[in-house]
Regions:
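A short glycine-rich, hydrophobically flanked beta-strand micro-motif that places a catalytic Asp/Glu
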Residues: 4-5, 76-88
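A sequence-composition feature that detects small, non-aromatic residues
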Residues: 19, 31, 49-50, 60-61, ...
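Phosphate-interacting basic helix/loop segments used at nucleotide- and nucleic-acid interfaces
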Residues: 1
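Conserved protein kinase catalytic/activation segment
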Residues: 90-93
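Peripheral (often C-terminal) accessory segments that flank ATP-dependent C-N-forming ligase machineries
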Residues: 121-210
Length: 210
């Protein structure tokens, strides 16, 4: 049994960090995303439905602390961290760290930083790599934008997401025109429509009761 302090706050109080540490145990890449909305279903709890990348949210003190944490452990490879901002104390609380890429880690590639590039250049090409901190703006999503627009309650974040979508600086996890065929198209439409149904059903309790 693991007991964890309850940290109040909406889904957008979360932060997600994806990092890569080289064979020399030094951090080579850090990409901090701000989730806009999480999955709401029982089986989806803990997964993100939309993530905003914006250098304005790159908290320098937080990134430095996480960098030192990884290097002090002599970490090697990928690290995926879930963190939440506690408005009561003004501090960030780490929930967990996974030794792998996360389900939503494509948000890093969507921002222009392909995680695999750092792995290949470090392990296979033996390049000397410094620290890169992702600093571009982009919107990653797996849910349809209509769901995000309806359930994201923060007007400032919604305005930022709207702007990125209008500028074409967004990526959808499941949309890949090179893979397109009729069967996939029908599955994709069904999957996206289902987000409206299941989010309406579980929003506010995340499947803890029906």
């Amino acid at each position: 049994l693991i007991l964890q302090e309850y940290i109040p706050g909406d889904d957008n109080c979360m932060r997600v960090l994806n990092a890569y540490c080289g064979l020399d145990h030094k951090v080579k890449l850090m990409a901090l995303g701000r989730p806009l909305l999480e999955e709401q279903t029982p089986e989806g709890i803990g997964n993100y439905a939309a993530i905003l990348s914006d250098p304005e949210y790159n908290d320098a003190a937080l990134l430095e602390k996480l960098k030192n944490f990884l290097e002090d452990m002599q970490w090697e490879g990928f690290a995926n961290m879930d963190i939440k901002y506690d408005a009561r104390t003004g501090e960030y609380k780490m929930f967990e760290m996974n030794p792998r890429q996360g389900r939503s880690s494509y948000f890093v590639t969507a921002a222009g930083y392909n995680l695999s590039k750092w792995l290949v250049e470090d392990v296979l090409e033996h390049k000397e790599l410094g620290l890169t901190i992702a600093d571009t703006k982009s919107l990653w999503m797996i849910a349809p934008y209509g769901v995000i627009k309806k359930y994201l309650k923060d007007p400032d974040l919604l305005a930022r997401a709207d702007k990125l979508k209008k500028e074409g600086k967004c990526a959808h996890q499941l949309f890949c025109k090179e893979d397109w065929n009729l069967k996939r198209w029908l599955w994709y439409i069904r999957s996206q429509l289902n987000y409206y149904r299941k989010t309406a059903r579980y929003y506010g309790n995340k499947g803890l009761r029906d």
